[in-house]
Design a protein with these regions (language model features):
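Short acidic/polar active-site loop segments enriched in Thr and Asp
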Residues: 40, 127, 221-222, 290, ...
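Alpha-helical scaffold segments that flank or form the walls of functional sites
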Residues: 104-126, 208, 217, 280-286
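A charged helix-plus-loop insertion that forms the helical arch/lid used to bind
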Residues: 92-105, 149-151
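Short, conserved phosphate-binding/catalytic loop or strand-edge motifs used
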Residues: 134-144
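Second-shell residues forming the walls of enzyme active-site clefts
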Residues: 8, 20, 26, 47-70, ...
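Catalytic domains of carbohydrate-active enzymes, especially glycoside hydrolases
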Residues: 32-45, 115-128
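Preference for extracellular/luminal or secreted protein segments
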Residues: 1-37, 275-525
């Protein structure tokens, strides 16, 4: 691998950028990024992946091109958090998400899910997982974190997140704590707006920073930034990603972090809309971010590289700091390549372990006095199809629905797919149809945000029919339901979850999960 002393200015700058592309094969404009601008790192999404063999071939191709053009192996990165943020297709082994794992009550499960994920990714040639999420989901109205977090207390997030870090590293894959210094206590999605968390340093140390400190102590080699304003830390109205006070002053100097700092995508609206992606990339580099992501648009990555080159040549970007950052990247890549991975077992063992954890995550937030209602002879299964509730999720619908999958399992009753935000007319029609059924099984998907789902739930509950309500993403949908409604947290909208849920619905299995949310626990009592 090329040394720092052997690298040109353009090659150094290329080490500090990661870029993505559309489609299953890299287009010409993306290859131009590598060949002309020496971009040395890649991010993959579901849009780039058809199946395991195709992903393995793609990673090998990309690695070969980058090594030939830059003399340095690339980091090939991916967001494989588990649950609602998974980039591998359904045919591969996907783990439950963070909050589901925490609901099992066993931190060892977080370690095993990290080890399993690393084994899976490494087998395809992906060497850097952009996980775990170390945000504390202390705001129930948070539209982007939710079940991606391990819970709403710093202690739980620190414990489970640190175990995930250890599992990923033992499995031979680099990982990154995100989103520093915290994205949990906001009701704004930074993909779409510019959130603000108005806390002092001491307040952050008491809550938001605790999981990050624990993750760093567990050996996390990278930390991802967040595009959020922290006005008591950075008064210049710039988000953490672009703030030298936060990236260098707080993370490097006060917390003593010596690994690589990486950005969230600079095409998110918190940057693109308010500051501009190209300007934001340079500001992040100057703030102390080692690896900056332009994940969607190769043309923007070209502009960012051209702008960074001009800044390096005119003295705006400090060349000594550039060298320190690039050397840090080279050492990280050498360390990653030298990892000696452990394994959890063969594919069948990994799949079985993931399903064991998923089944253990299903949580009864409330059961009626008589226990789980019986489905009876003619159950009504209903709920909306999944939808992209945040840009962090995958870009396409799953192609299956909760009602239809449950009806298939039951082999009786009716499946009814509702709108994601049903209006009064649809609610009235659904309630009239429900009267003929023995039991109502309703699946919601962030109904606490799209309130029509909860209006439907309460209207159905008012019929007095036996009813089971299943939250298929954030469990806040389960608040304030009548006592006769059984309320279950399923955490995700996936076929493996539906398969694990069916024995609970038909009475042959008991939900054993424990709610990892103090706020919802209090509300449920």
């Amino acid at each position: 691998m090329r040394t720092l002393q052997e690298m040109t200015l353009q090659e150094k700058l290329g080490q500090r950028l990661a870029a993505g592309f559309q489609g299953l094969e890299p287009p010409k404009e993306f290859l131009r990024l590598i060949k002309e601008y020496k971009v040395g790192n890649i991010i993959l999404f579901r849009r780039n992946i058809q199946d395991g063999p195709q992903l393995k071939k793609l990673c090998a191709t990309l690695r070969k091109v980058v090594e030939e053009e830059t003399g340095v192996t690339p980091f090939i990165t991916i967001d494989q958090e588990g649950g609602v943020v998974t980039r591998l297709p359904e045919s591969e082994v996907n783990i439950p998400g963070a909050m589901a794992v925490a609901a099992t009550g066993n931190p060892r499960n977080a370690y095993d899910m990290g080890l399993l994920t690393a084994q899976e990714l490494r087998s395809y040639g992906v060497d850097f997982n952009l996980a775990p999420v170390m945000d504390i989901n202390c705001n129930p109205d948070n539209p982007v974190i939710g079940v991606r977090s391990y819970g709403d207390t710093p202690e739980r997030v620190a414990e489970y997140g640190s175990q995930m870090v250890r599992g990923l590293l033992d499995g031979g894959v680099y990982c990154s704590l995100k989103h520093f210094p915290g994205h949990g206590d906001t009701a704004v999605d930074s993909h779409l707006g510019l959130p603000c968390i108005d806390r002092s340093f001491d307040e952050l140390m008491q809550r938001e920073l605790k999981p990050f400190i624990a993750g760093i102590e567990a050996g996390a080699p990278a930390v991802m930034t967040t595009h959020i304003l922290f006005p008591q830390i950075e008064p210049e109205h710039i988000p953490a990603t672009m703030s030298r006070r936060i990236m260098t002053g707080l993370l490097r100097e006060k917390l003593g972090f010596g690994g690589i700092i990486i950005s969230d995508c600079m095409e998110m609206d918190a940057i693109k809309k308010f500051y501009g992606t190209v300007n934001g990339v340079l500001a992040a580099m100057k703030a102390g971010v080692d690896l900056v992501f332009v994940s969607q648009t190769p043309a923007l990555a070209v502009e960012a590289m051209q702008n960074a080159r001009r800044a390096a040549e005119n003295g705006e970007l400090d060349l000594a700091e550039l060298d320190v950052s690039v050397q840090r990247m080279l050492e990280a890549k050498a360390q990653c390549a030298a990892m000696q991975p452990k394994t959890l077992g063969d594919e069948a063992a990994c799949r079985a372990r993931a399903e064991e954890v998923r089944a253990a995550s299903i949580t009864a937030v409330h059961l009626p006095q008589g226990g789980m209602p019986a489905l009876g002879d003619n159950p009504l299964f209903l709920g909306c199809a999944d939808y992209r509730s945040t840009i962090a999720s995958n870009g396409e619908s799953s192609g299956f629905t909760f009602p239809e999958e449950m009806r298939r399992h039951a082999d009786k009753g009716t499946a009814l797919v509702t709108d994601k935000d049903p209006g009064d007319a649809e609610i009235a029609e659904v309630v009239s149809q429900a009267a003929a059924h023995s039991c109502i099984v309703l699946g919601t998907y962030n109904g606490h945000i799209l309130q029509g789902q909860l209006r439907l739930a309460k209207a159905l509950a008012a019929t007095g029919l036996p009813m089971i309500l299943v939250a298929l993403r954030n469990p806040y949908d389960l608040r304030n339901m009548p006592n006769h409604v059984a309320a279950l947290a399923g955490w995700e909208y996936t076929r493996p979850l539906f398969d694990a849920l069916w024995p609970v619905l038909n009475g042959t299995a008991r939900p054993t999960g424990k709610l990892p949310l103090l706020t919802l626990t209090k509300a449920a009592k």
